């Protein structure tokens, strides 16, 4: 039964889901039309929302491109290849291969979302070389499916933001949040950890059960996954000797390590100090170290850059979509995202409020696939309503966080780094991800219903 459902989803997605760039354009058209009545804007004003926002994610786009490039350059270094091969060697059958890559991807995403996006896909590639008969599409989908827990993990941007309430945080929540909320009430709360644990147990089993029959498996030739061996040349000129000079790489590593030690020492709690820039710096330092010589690292980066085209092209369009979603004719006026959030707030009561906050966040995330954007859109609506109803703001913040992560399983935006590493397209994995979306959605919905009853 499960295989019939998953096969049906895969068939539908492969038939009807276009290239992610076309998907961007279609989403832009949909939100453009919807924003006119929702925000009370003219078409020219909506064009203005789009145009003033299209370049608003340039820094973030570069960060995401670096997650892919630096993570790949590090993970393709000879020592890391050997480590991944050893881990991949644990899997002997397609079932164990899918379970292993899902567990690793989920745990890695909970620890840090940038790390999780990269390590799961790279492990999946290593497993594909070793395990015969495993479906490559499902391997990559399984690696990505663990990303659903990222915003309920240690690098979740919303839980980290509210650990220190600044004037900006108070303003972003419409004046509702005036006291800090520790991680013990959000990410490390018992109910959140239980939800993550249930997903960690059930998601690998679900993914493994979705594995197609032998006659329907889509495999990849292991030869296509083998990178060219690095040839050791004999440097004959001063320039070549500099390019192969390991001490130059060591100097970069020393500087980077010293800074990281200072940074984490000053931060107090290392886990709370992790952010995208620090993750990228760690990838950079490790990549330079593990590739040996400066020129080897340059070659590794050049190879990795080839997979970053989708990020470079599509992220500006999602920034434009976010601009349309959040755009208002007057300051504090209605916006399309606000209308969606307000609707769910209006139909909620004390018990269903966390559930409907989660569902509304999932819908908004489909058009605003950014934790920061999600917070900017929903916090001014959800948090004042939370305080007015006498509910726990920590639960509301986590409901937004879970919704933000949940529909990433159906949103190609965040899958781009993993797809770039794997050499696949969105339609190759999204059919499987639809089933994962349903399972994780049920788990989280039940969680918030229970939390609402407590």
Each model region followed by its residue ranges:
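Transmembrane alpha-helical segments of multi-pass membrane transport proteins and ion-pumping complexes
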Residues: 36, 60, 64, 72-77, ...
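Alpha-helical transmembrane segments of multi-pass membrane proteins
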Residues: 94-109, 133-157, 161, 176-180, ...
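Membrane-interfacial loop-to-helix junctions in multi-pass transporters
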Residues: 19, 54-61, 88-100, 131-139, ...
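Flexible loop linkers connecting adjacent transmembrane helices
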Residues: 5-9, 42-50, 75-91, 124-136, ...
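Membrane-core helix-loop-helix motifs of multi-pass transport proteins
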Residues: 123-218, 392, 414-447
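Hydrophobic transmembrane alpha-helices of multi-pass small-molecule transporters
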Residues: 1-69, 188-201, 205-314, 435-438, ...
């Amino acid at each position: 039964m499960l295989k019939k459902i998953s096969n049906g989803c895969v068939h539908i997605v492969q038939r009807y889901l276009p290239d992610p760039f076309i998907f961007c354009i279609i989403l832009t058209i949909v939100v453009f039309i919807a924003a006119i009545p929702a925000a009370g804007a003219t078409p020219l004003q909506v064009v203005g929302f789009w145009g003033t926002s299209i370049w608003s994610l340039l820094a973030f786009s570069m960060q995401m491109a670096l997650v892919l490039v630096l993570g790949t350059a590090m993970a393709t270094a000879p020592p890391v290849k050997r480590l991944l091969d050893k881990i991949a060697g644990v899997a002997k059958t397609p079932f164990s291969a899918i379970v292993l890559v899902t567990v690793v991807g989920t745990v890695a995403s909970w620890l840090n979302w940038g790390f999780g996006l990269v390590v799961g896909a790279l492990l999946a590639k290593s497993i594909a070389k070793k395990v015969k008969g495993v479906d490559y599409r499902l391997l990559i989908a399984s690696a990505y499916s663990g990303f659903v827990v990222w915003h309920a993990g240690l690098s979740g941007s919303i839980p980290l933001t509210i650990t220190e309430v600044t004037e900006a945080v108070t303003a972003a929540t419409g004046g509702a949040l005036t006291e800090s909320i520790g991680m013990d009430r959000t990410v490390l709360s018992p109910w959140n950890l239980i939800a993550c644990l249930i997903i960690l147990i059930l998601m690998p089993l679900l993914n493994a059960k979705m594995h197609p029959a032998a006659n329907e498996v889509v495999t990849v030739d292991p030869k296509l996954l083998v990178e060219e061996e690095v040839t050791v040349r004999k440097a004959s000129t001063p320039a070549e000797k500099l390019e192969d000079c390991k001490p130059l790489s060591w100097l970069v590593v020393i500087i980077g390590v010293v800074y990281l030690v200072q940074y984490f020492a000053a931060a107090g709690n290392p886990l709370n100090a992790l952010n995208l820039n620090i993750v990228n710096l760690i990838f950079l330092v490790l990549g330079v170290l593990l590739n040996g010589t400066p020129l080897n690292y340059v070659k590794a980066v050049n190879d990795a850059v080839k997979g970053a085209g989708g990020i470079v092209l599509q992220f500006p369009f999602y920034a434009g979509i976010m601009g349309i979603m959040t755009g208002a004719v007057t300051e504090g006026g209605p916006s399309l995202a606000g209308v969606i959030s307000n609707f769910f707030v209006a139909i909620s009561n004390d018990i269903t409020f966390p559930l409907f906050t989660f569902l509304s966040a999932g819908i908004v995330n489909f058009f605003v696939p950014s934790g920061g954007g999600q917070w900017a859109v929903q916090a001014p609506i959800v948090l004042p309503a939370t305080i007015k109803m006498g509910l726990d703001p920590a639960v509301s913040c986590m409901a937004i966080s879970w919704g933000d992560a949940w529909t990433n399983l159906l949103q190609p935006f965040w899958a781009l780094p993993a797809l770039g590493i794997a050499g696949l397209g969105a339609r190759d994995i999204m059919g499987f991800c639809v089933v994962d979306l349903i399972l994780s959605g049920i788990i989280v919905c039940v969680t918030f219903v229970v939390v609402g009853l407590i």
